[in-house]
Each structure stands twice: as C-alpha cells, then as structure tokens.
Amino acid sequence: MKLEHDISVVHTTHPFVIARGGASDHRLIRVRIRDDDGVEGWGEAAPNRFYGETADTALAALARLAPIVEACDPWKLEEVETELNRALRFNGSVKSAISAALHDLIGKRLGVPVYRLWGLDPARAPLSSFTIAIAASDAELRERIAQAATYPVLKIKLGTDRDEQIIRTVRDAAPGKILRVDANAAWSPKHALRMIEVLVECGVEYVEQPVAAHDLDGMRFVRERSTLPVIADESCVVSTDIPRLVGVADGINIKLSKCGGLREALRMIAIARAHGMLVMAGCMIETSLGITAAAHFAPLLDYADFDGAALLADDPYRGATINGGAIAIPEGPGLGVTRR
C-alpha cells in the first residue's frame, strides 16, 4: 500500500471565533491510502493548536507513520490503530485521518458504507446543532442567527465579557430553537454557576466545557451545583480520560481530531455508556470528508455537532449533510465521500 497526502486551505463563511481566538482560513490535510490494485481510502486531518498540532507537525507525523501504514494489513483495523498509538502518543488528527482512510478502503472493498460494518441504523442519528460563533456586535449575531433559520438546534459559543447579552440576544432572536452553550473552558467555576443561572432562564439544554480543561475539581464543583448537564470536551481527549471524569461531568464530547481514530471513538462511546454518561460528538472546522467519517457513528450518540463543513464557503467534497439539522449519512461504499 501507499500513503499519500495533499494540503488544502478552506475558508469559513464568517470568521470562526471562540473564547480563545479564531480565524477564517484553515489548513487541512487529505490522506490517501492506495492499495496495490488502485483502490483508495480517504481521510482528513484537521490539526488544532490547542491539542499541540499544526499542519507542519501533522506532516511530520505522517512521515513517521507512513512505514507502519504501508506495511499494514488494512483489514486489521484495531491492530493498526494500536500500532499508530504506540508510535505516536499525540497527533490525534493525523491518526484519525489514517483510521478513516482505512475504514473507507475496507468499506469500498466490501461494497458497503462504514456504518454497516458496525451494524448501525442511520435513522437513529440525532439532530446536529449549528454553531453560532462569537460575533463582534448584536447586529452581526442576529444576522448569523437569521442565516441559520433552517437549523432547529443552535450551539452558542461564549467566553467573553458580553456572554449574558449574547445568550439573551440569541434567545430573543430564536425563541423556538433548542439552544446549547459552549464556553470553551473560559469561565472560572464560580462564574460558571452565575452564568448557568442565566442559561437556565434562557432555556439552554446543556453547557459544554465551562471551566479550564485541567480543572477537574472546578468542573466537579460546577456539576454538583448545576441544574444543567455539563459536557466535557477539552477535558476529554481519549478513552483513558473518561474514568476520571465520572462524577465530574455528565457527558463527553468525542472528536476524531482529538481521539485519533474511529476504533478509539467507538471505544470512548462504550466506556462512557458503561459509566452512565451522555455522549456527544463534535468536530473542528473540517470539510465533508472529515465530517462524514464521524457521521458514520452518529446513530450511537445522544447529541451531535457536525457543522464543520456547513460553516465553509468552499467545501471541496460531497458527503454527509446536516440539512435542517438532520444528519444524512452517504449510502455509497466506505465513507461515501466524492469530490465536487
């Protein structure tokens, strides 16, 4: 087999700003694994600096992992992910891209979509939220909410000195929508509790990562006093993080770019369920190639946030969609992703 890659720069329709900053352009890496007879599997890496990755470090990681991939038996999906993790502890986006490409390859070999490899029913996928990033003004915020009119579930990014004003504006502009909030680790525990009172008043469904990723005592403090479910995102990267989050958070947010592969994502779901926790999955800014890989396990989730490609002005792929919030998983073999 041969491991190849190419780099692309994609652009969001609006600057995607969260509590720790933002940008409009994003470098992504497409991974191609080509078997000896020409069958290809595709995957996508969306490196994120918060988790110690950039496009440059991702390329270096790919070079290091290439010998493992090119010598592997693609049918041994679990074994390959184990070998990748032994070779590199971090670089989750690169490992997840390789994992997705191998699943794509095997699905194409068998002529079935990846979700069928796992025995899943796509009709059981939850609605996806659509993210409203931090806007510069109330007028801009209302404009973005209007543009998201077809989405029944909105995820609101907070973590500013205007948070109460933002969430009240959103509720006023979208009185009938389900609202979820993501503070991206921006609040102190006590401020989180003050904000949760406002969120409850505004009918918010849950709050995601209210405090710093490392502050598990602070998150436990919030969770024990909160009337809203608390979901751990930045605090939950891989499956071994989950046991220490029991009693600290009500649920976890899985992202392929964090956890490093589809097998690991399935493992995280199983472990969280065993502990009675809620399970959601999210994304970085990704094209439909990256989003579709995660969408194949959407039927196992309580909540989904698969809007990464919907936020783009220039998505180069066709794959899973979230029209009206409903996740439509491709029926084609493998991931079912094609170029536009």
Predicted features, each with a name:
Residues M1-L179, N184-L193, E197-E201, R225, ...:
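N-terminal capping/lid subdomain adjacent to the active-site entrance of alpha/beta enzymes
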Residues A309:
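Active-site cofactor/co-catalyst pockets and adjacent glycine-rich loops in catalytic enzymes
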Residues I106-R109, H296-L300:
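Alpha-helix C-terminal capping segments
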